[in-house]
Amino acid sequence: MIEIRNLTKKFGDFTAVDHLNLTIETNEFMGLLGPNGAGKTTTISMMSTVLLPTEGEILIDGEQLNRKAATAKRKLSVVTQEFSMRQDMTMNEVMEYQGRLYYMRKKEIRAKTEELFEFAGLSQFGHRVVRHLSGGMKRKLMICRALMTEPQILLLDEPTAGMDALARRQMWDLLRSLKDRNLTILLTTHFIDEAQALCNRVAFIDGGKFDVVDTPLALIEQLGPFAVDILQDNKLQSSYFPTREAAIERLRELPDDAVLRATTLEDVFVERVGHRLTRG
């Protein structure tokens, strides 16, 4: 279990993360959803001890996480947004190097590499040099590298950033399969459809603060599962209703170009935070 208590990070007079409180249960897939600059990466950086908090603390199974907390740190791995690998290495060499950092035996490294590459669909590419990989393959390799030491917690910072639609959906399939590995996962993203498709719960973050934390379905139900859209003065106006019947009744009162549709997580975010995030 991860407990984030009063977590704050300041850079001079600028507060990047502002008194966050959150509990992530064991084996939960948690999404941290917000626009660029909202504080997502700063939060991940503190959880990976790259940055130290100005205030507050992070607990991993009750143990405070810091740069000296060896037991807690061994429980987690991070997949950063940047491609943090030597470009002249082969994929097999990347995995071997990671294994040696953790004093794994050669036989163990080889077996684990084979298992993870099969899991990620990379089995036939082990001898390919990193610089020749697509962005999607690099991210898959980074996930395999992060899983090399069998962590209990996986931190994923914008894992589909820069991918085209097909590559993103393929990555989603891989991320869904991580649920079968008994991992606690924290995913940061600015793609609303990604959070809705993958996460058990989502936390909206904006300006370094949490706005709301709940399941995607519960958030949609709170706003109203049915929406009616109408274009007024070249602006899309949306209204939300608790039942389909109520939405249809409103629809009858509007011009013919009004549209009935299902409410999405994006609608919830726009209503709560006031930002229009990137559509998938």
Question: Where are the predicted features?
Answer:
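Conserved ABC transporter NBD signature motif
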Residues: 56-67, 71-72
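Hydrophobic anchor residue at the start of the ABC signature
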Residues: 143
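Conserved catalytic motifs of ABC-family nucleotide-binding domains
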Residues: 150
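Catalytic Walker B motif of ABC-type/P-loop ATPase nucleotide-binding domains
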Residues: 154-157
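ABC transporter nucleotide-binding domain
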Residues: 170-247
